[in-house]
Amino acid sequence: MPNLQQTASQSQHHLHPHHLRPQQQQQQHHHHHQQQQQQQHTHHQQQQQHHSDFPLPDGWDIAKDFDGKTYYIDHINKKTTWLDPRDCYTKPQTFEDCVGDELPMGWEESYDPNIGPYYINHLAQSTQLEDPRQEWKTVQEQMLSDYLSAAQDQLENKREMFDVKQQRLLWAQEEYNHLKLAASRSSLCSSSSSMSRHDPELLRADLMLARERVHQLKQELTHITNDISYTERGMNTLYSVGEKINARENGCYDIAEVHAIREEMLKVHKSLVSGEKVREELMRSLVQIKNELGRQQISEENSDLASPFDRVCVASQTDLCGSSGENLNGGARFAEMAKTKWQYAEWRKHIKKLQQQLADHVERIEPGQLESDKDRILLIQEKEKLLNDLNSISLKSRSEEEKRVIHQTRHKLEEDLKEAYEANNTCVANRLRFHEEKQLLLDKLQEALKSTKLLEERLKSFSSESTFSISSGSSLGSLSTASSKSALSFTDIYIDPFAVDSPIDVVDLRRRSQRLFQQHQQQRLHPVHPVLQQQQSAEVTLSPRSSLSMETPPASPMKYNAGADQTPQALKEEPTYANALPAPPAYTAPPPVPISGVRARPYDLDSTVLDCMMLEAKLQKLNMGTPLNLAVAPLSPISEKPSLLDLPQEMLSRSSSTSNTRSVSAAVSNESVAGDSGVFEASRAHLPRKELAQVQIGLKYLKQEGVLVVSLERANNLLALWTASADNSQVYLRAALLPNSLTSIRTKALGDFQKPVFNDTFAVPITLDKLLTKSLQVTVVTMTGQKEEIIGTVQISMAEFNPEDSTLKWYNVLSSKFIPSFESLDIPSTSAAAAAAAVAASNAPNPGNNREESSDESTITSSQTSTLTRNQAPCMELQEQMAAELLGLGPLNEPECSDDDDDDEEEELDDKQLVSDVGLMNSSSMLHAYLQNMKQEFADKETNTDRAYLPEKSRGQSQLMDDRPVKRSQTFTPSEAFSKNRYNCRLNRSDSDSAMHCGVAPHTFQRGAAERRSLRFHSKAPKSVTKLHHTHIPRTSLDLELDLQAQHSKLYFLNDQIAKLQNLKEVLQKACENKDPLVAAWAIENEEFQRLVARADPAKCPEERQLQKLLMKTAKEIHKLRKTKVPKGCPDLVSFKEKITFFTRKGLSVPELPSEFTLPEANPIEEEEEEEDENEFYNSAETAIAINTALVASSNRNKNLSEHPHRATSGAVPKIPAPVVTPAATPAATPAATPAATSAATPAATPVVSPAAQPDAKPADAPIPVASNDAEQQRFDYVVDRNYGVEV
């Protein structure tokens, strides 16, 4: 026994890796596996506890490595291993015997902080990324094979379209040569007997049209060739990926290769970032050159005309923009801010809803199917055009052989078209309908993002003008990239606006499909949505000659009938605030130029615009449940200038544009907003005045007396506001000047609701300067017995009132049902004399109330805002009520996905900060309750700390009320009497303490803080780093290889784009220096070039650029929302399909200058060129035979594709043959990159093993040195391998 122990001890000492491993190898080995030691150690400890009931077999022993990791010694075979020999008794032997999440004997799961979980096969001495228990890898391979089969059919469609287009080009060239020959001969022996053929002018015009047609067909042929090259390259990449994965053992990468691929992807990503900067700089240079060419062309045409690139004064349109908050006192600004916060919260909720709808919609759409449907429809159209071209050929001068060939070609085309028409295309129509619905949701989302950004900027402007704080960053505006320490996400690789071409016009495509396939069902289909009828010109059309996507000028909203044009489904949808914007998407598509020009700063809008957005949206939300006409719903109360048709003749010469137009009006109509924005000229012709509730009000100011005369004349159709019975009810009008109105004036009560005539005049003493800062609020009140109810309101801005004139206008009344709640008016009604006396008393000085608050001058100065607003503070009960409503709303930002990136955490924190700072308040209830309950003591007094307390004898009565203590800043004067025991006065020295609303959490006052704003600007809490984002979605080697090849493809096309942009820049610079008119005309008229430079136009307003970033971020959020629906541990099929379709999508195309702008001009008069022209004339018979042969060959190659759109192939798919493309018509696919572009966009060679490196996928063939370690290594009999546990 001692000998055995000694032998075991010696053997253990001999086999211990700490003594056998060289020092260098030991350190390298320890560093390589240091990250997984703890987890594997825990695993083996659990294994020891689990195997404690079973003894070790004979000849086995347990030892620990220098780092504490347990391994096992087989003394019989003289080997060491990580596997416990007792696993054969406790673990299943095969995967079929496993239950739940068990792994069979010899398998181990480990975790790497960079690549996540991976698996070790100790028996086969290998590691792999895939989970061996899941069959996701097999599903991926089958999906890849199916897609390659479908992509092969799509490629055949493109090639057949190329053949048909080439045949059309041949016929067009033949027609052009016929016309040239006829024009050059200029004799009666022409090929046609028509006398019009002999007119030189007509011949010249026909020749011009034929030349343009040939040029256009060549351009279309170039586009198709580029599409074929993009598709072929993508399919070749997918084939190479599949072959590379299948060539490996088990189709899996080991961990070392995964690390190498990951490092290579990060390096390529850095190259992409630097290359994108180079591309952006080139595009900005192209914009400058294009503008210079435009100036040169305009100066050549007419030097007297002003350049359109000069600055245009829009002072008349932006006169409303000024800082409206400057003329608003604290109370009105507080109310305006609360309304804006409420709107912002509602918009955020609506955006979340749209994102969820888009995430649900994407699941019903097959990735890449839209491109296939487009190719199929365009192929049929090309055949139709070729058939029309053949039918238009005159056969009189043709030989019999030519006639026979033409007839055969026509017959073949007719048969192909008949088969296409008779095919079942219901699926195509349904898919296009899904895409159209998706486009509609995207348009709604874009409008929602615009409105949200406008409100966000509005809130930031409030923050700069008041003491309320708002976070400097918002999730909607921040678009930080993922951390460089983490791997690239799906959205970083595959969601790139420059990686794919412009989106397809789905509406145009669906119209084509309806015309081709479903002409007999057009009446049963839903009409196209008005928004989609006016796609922007930035979207690419299906063909250069397509006229289906032409823009139409926007019409006036007053000419739009929603009930007639919108579908019932659209009418039943929940309306959004976007319907009330100046360019509402439900009414008319906003033109890009006027909006960007007028609204360069959306947060400078007047408060009336925001009120319109809220009130009009509430109007539609309450009335869109039933299919109502817009004419039935009353417009919002307006203070807009009436049309010239409403003004008397003596007032037509007066203009109100010079008056102060800063307004505090509650709302304006859609017409006034759109009219002010310059989109259209407001029209009165279609205003349904007879169905609106209106009030006629007269205003006149007497300067000598200092009195405003208000005349409440009559009303019209008040029954539109009163839903109950008008029997035993009366109505009267009540008016008050807001804010800080002591009194209100009221008319007599009448029983007529249809056309009541009041004829009541009141005099309100007020100075002119104060009058221009107020607004007149007129409310319509009904009385039924002792009960009074407000049924409508009108608010008129006195800023637009001209004191020199007397006005008498009709104003629309907003119904009270569109406002959440109205509090009863507690302001007593008085006569004009009483009002004058009250105003006079309020203007009297009161020196007894002037008390010095603090000797600190800085504190007094910084408290001016709160001091001026002390009389506008709402009562404490109202604040507590609003706080309770805030708590009831709950947070807006719900966690979307458990595996968000670090930047998403920051954005969520910004969202919470913004929401907490903004405070979600019920705007209408706060506004009206505050304005009606407010009581003014003094108008202009300094800091007041005195107040009237309830006498002690009234404590018994006050017990019935709320006994909660009232904590208020001493700089505020409470508007209600409280007991001294309930009132706690605090003298705050910070400039922001006294104005902080109840929605902001209190923070400790920091003495000596920067600018004494410790409560406004406080440091954000550090982000928690304890949360680990461990994804449970399986990731395979095929996913990793696809990601790597996608990065290489993006880099390849980026170098291609940079080279083309550099070439285009050089050519345009030379043309600009030489003042070449042809190149200048091409740069201005080419639509593709215009779309390209529009992406980087510095003249584009920052809001549009921010909107593009928001759309990009929203796409990522939609992807995350869709991922949350995938069950935990299940593969995401849609994401994988999007990965493989990424390779066959066409990237951003850069236009190339044509080598020849025009074909050689034909001279119809000179006959010296007759012989030369005859030599250029083609043999018509040979041309027709060649066309027929090519058509038959292409038809045989692509027969019955519509019946088998997704033909799956079993086994490996053969390599793609080369496309049948004419060399003369094929442009250079990969021009050499310029040295600057190559140095900026090509990644440096790195000494890493890259098993996924593709020679054809890299932009530059930089040699990558293979990592080799030829150093002398010592060999031992037994060395513990830390991965496999076998002898090395």
Swiss-Prot record:
Keywords: Cell membrane, Coiled coil, Cytoplasm, Membrane, Phosphoprotein, Repeat, Transcription, Transcription regulation. Residues 54-87, 101-134 form the WW domain. The modification Phosphoserine is found at S992. The keyword NAD does not apply. Residues 1-60, 541-560, 841-869, 890-912, 942-975, 1224-1269 are annotated as: Disordered. CDD domains: C2_Kibra (cd08680), WW (cd00201). Expressed in ovarian posterior follicle cells and wing disks (at protein level). Residues 942-966 have a biased composition (Basic and acidic residues). Regulator of the Hippo/SWH (Sav/Wts/Hpo) signaling pathway, a signaling pathway that plays a pivotal role in organ size control and tumor suppression by restricting proliferation and promoting apoptosis. The core of this pathway is composed of a kinase cascade wherein Hippo (Hpo), in complex with its regulatory protein Salvador (Sav), phosphorylates and activates Warts (Wts) in complex with its regulatory protein Mats, which in turn phosphorylates and inactivates the Yorkie (Yki) oncoprotein. Kibra acts synergistically along with Ex and Mer to regulate the Hippo signaling pathway. This is Protein kibra. It comes from Drosophila melanogaster (Fruit fly). The lineage of its organism: Eukaryota, Metazoa, Ecdysozoa, Arthropoda, Hexapoda.
